[in-house]
Structures are given as structure tokens and as C-alpha cells.
Amino acid sequence: MLLKGENLVKNFGGTVAVNNVSFDVMNGEILAIIGPNGAGKSVLFSLISGLFQPTSGKISFEGENITGFKANAIARKGISRTFQLTALFDQLRVVDNLALGFQRRATSGFWGTLLHSSQWKADKAMMEAKVIEMLGFIGLENKTFDFVSTLSQGEQRRLSIGIALASDPVLILFDEPTGGLIQEDTDEITRLIRKINQTGITICLIEHKMRMVMDLASRIVVLNYGRKIAEGNPADIANDPQVIEAYLGRKRNA
């Protein structure tokens, strides 16, 4: 077991966004977390990634209690997260954005960088090689020197994924990676996520596009009004009465 959440609760004033949710993420799997809008999915990701602290409950990663850790400490442990809204430097080139992602792994420090030490030179060579390799992996090798502002939405999403990979994560949290994308770009992102998983990286995914979820996920957790209402393989979830009610009931009441 890679990640474990136990009886997680998150309150915002009088609103209970996550209500006694427990879940496991197994090493090497693709776990999808689904549910209607407002179900608590992104808040749960924020608890895992350290952006929010749980009101109560426990989070363990690789057997260590990481409850209450800040986001930067969580990232150093090997958990990376992507967001639906990309946070890229539009006025920089693709290669520069990726280089900034890899720069966080440099070990030369301030004085080493200032004095161009041997460690700085080694870090620079490593970073340049890694950037070139990553550009090929995410399919943007022909966009290396293009400015981010000229990329399509799908290409920007792939670049964001490349930056998340630059931290050498054990687990990636994908928060609606295909939100707002056309089908062609959705298919491209689906293939990329599968390729990432095949390298041994564990995936936890929030997504509304059910065809994609059913195609990718080995297990699915379903949230509704902050509570976990179902968990199982895609076939079981597709036929679960509570899941059907959560989706169809919301539509009828809309």
C-alpha cells in the first residue's frame, strides 16, 4: 500500500467538505476518484498534497504518517499534483518552463550556482539532458523553443504534466487532466497517463469524463456530498445503484 487515508474530515466553517472518508492507493495502480460537482474530490486532493490540513483523520504515505505536512514537504516525499488550470509562464519558452521544474532537484546551492562550481556544472548538464528526454516523453519535442502562449490547450496540459514529472514523483495526483479539452486532446492525455503509469508511477485521478475513467482506472472511489458512497472496479461502479442515483439524481434536480 502506497497511500492511506483514514477517517478524513475537512470542515470549512459550518460546511463539511470531506466527511469521514477512508481510502487506499496501491503501489503501481491507477485509482480514479469520481463524483458530482461539489462532492469533495478536489478538497480531498488538497488534503493529500498538503494545501489544506484535515480537521481530523490521518494520511499515511509509504508507511509514514504525513498528516499536517506542508505542501513542499509532501512534494519532497514524492507526491506531485497537476491542476485543471495550468500554472505556466506564458512569456517563457517550453524548454524554459521544463528547466524550472528540473531546477528544483539541483543540489549545487546558492554559492555553487554563483561560483559555477563543479556540482553546478553537473546539475546543469543533468538538467539539459532531462529536459530533452522529457520533451520527447510528453510529445513536445517539436515545440522546444516555442513560447507557452502559442501552445494549444492540450499542449499546455502536456507541458504541465511534464513539469509534474520533473520532480521525480512516486505518486501523481491528476485533478481533471482533460477538463475543457476536445476529444483528440483527451485521447492524447489518456495515452500519456497510461505511459506514465507503465514507468512505475502510481496515479490517482479526478475526472468527469467517464469513458476515460473506465478505460484507465483499475479501481474507482465515488464521493457524494463529501462522503464515500462506493468503491470497486469499473464494472462494479458502473452498475452500483448509489452511484447511478448520485449522478442521475443530481441531473434531475438541476
Positions of PLM-derived features:
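The feature captures the beta-strand-to-loop junction immediately N-terminal to the Walker
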Residues: I34-P36
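Helix-to-loop junction immediately C-terminal to a conserved catalytic motif
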Residues: S49
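Conserved ABC ATPase "signature" region
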Residues: W111-K143, R191-R194
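Conserved catalytic motifs of ABC-family nucleotide-binding domains
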Residues: D168
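Conserved ABC nucleotide-binding domain
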Residues: T67-G68, M134-S152
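Catalytic Walker B motif of ABC-type/P-loop ATPase nucleotide-binding domains
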Residues: I172-E176
